[in-house]
């Protein structure tokens, strides 16, 4: 039987997320033994304090949700988040650079954050809904060469979330050693199971409680 809890990065990334909601997120993660809590970097100190002494990891997004900032700012934010207690980093690639053919710049962007995250797992968000298969494969191969821990489908803030065919393509490209995180629109146990069967080893969702309980998630959840 699948232990769904250990796949879940319990996530709250909304701009209007309150401290009380973040605290509740942490409490749910501890109660259900989720793998991690994933938040914006400004909430990392609070989450690190709430999760101290537990097995739940602290995950921060970087360059979120557009990925279009300066590379130096992403590296700075990642270091600041780690210093504040982040144990995993999820960064967004610069999709515009990729679609402009600036492949070396995309690689340098990832590498700069990877160097900051030398001691902790880095997950690279591709925003697959904006890419074609060739671009997905290109970034996955790039991440494998840079020894990135995970490739991740989506921010959940663009035109679409995780799709089985993209998860399967990512898994087939990176092989069995790297992680694949499916995120965005994974709101129930059936969808989570399909993503896992397609090759996902982590699920980013705000519907973790619904997934582990087998219940329906609230409308509009990440």
From Swiss-Prot:
Gene3D superfamilies linked: Aldolase class I
EC number: 4.1.2.4
Stored SUPFAM superfamilies: Aldolase
Reaction equations catalysed: 2-deoxy-D-ribose 5-phosphate = D-glyceraldehyde 3-phosphate + acetaldehyde
Location(s) in or outside the cell: Cytoplasm
PANTHER family: DEOXYRIBOSE-PHOSPHATE ALDOLASE
Annotated protein name in UniProt: Deoxyribose-phosphate aldolase
Source species of the chain: Pectobacterium carotovorum subsp. carotovorum (strain PC1)
């Amino acid at each position: 039987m699948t232990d769904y809890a250990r796949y879940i990065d319990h996530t709250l990334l909304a701009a209007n997320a309150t401290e009380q909601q973040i605290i509740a997120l942490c409490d749910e993660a501890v109660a259900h033994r989720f793998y991690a809590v994933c938040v914006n970097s400004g909430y990392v100190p609070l989450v690190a304090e709430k999760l101290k002494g537990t097995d739940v990891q602290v995950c921060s997004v970087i360059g979120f949700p557009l990925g279009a900032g300066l590379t130096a700012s992403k590296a700075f934010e990642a270091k600041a988040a780690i210093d504040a207690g982040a144990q995993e980093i999820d960064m967004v690639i610069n999709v515009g650079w990729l679609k402009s053919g600036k492949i070396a710049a995309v690689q340098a962007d990832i590498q700069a954050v990877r160097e900051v995250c030398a001691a902790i797992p880095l997950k690279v968000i591709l925003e697959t809904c904006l890419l074609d298969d060739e671009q997905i494969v290109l970034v996955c191969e790039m991440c494998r060469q840079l020894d990135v821990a995970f490739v991740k489908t989506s921010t959940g803030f663009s035109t679409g979330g995780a799709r089985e065919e993209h998860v399967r393509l990512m898994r087939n490209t990176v092989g069995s050693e790297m992680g694949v995180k499916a995120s965005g629109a994974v709101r129930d146990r059936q969808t989570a199971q399909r993503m896992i069967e397609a090759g996902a080893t982590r699920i980013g969702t705000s519907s973790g409680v619904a997934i582990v309980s087998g219940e329906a998630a609230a409308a509009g959840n990440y």
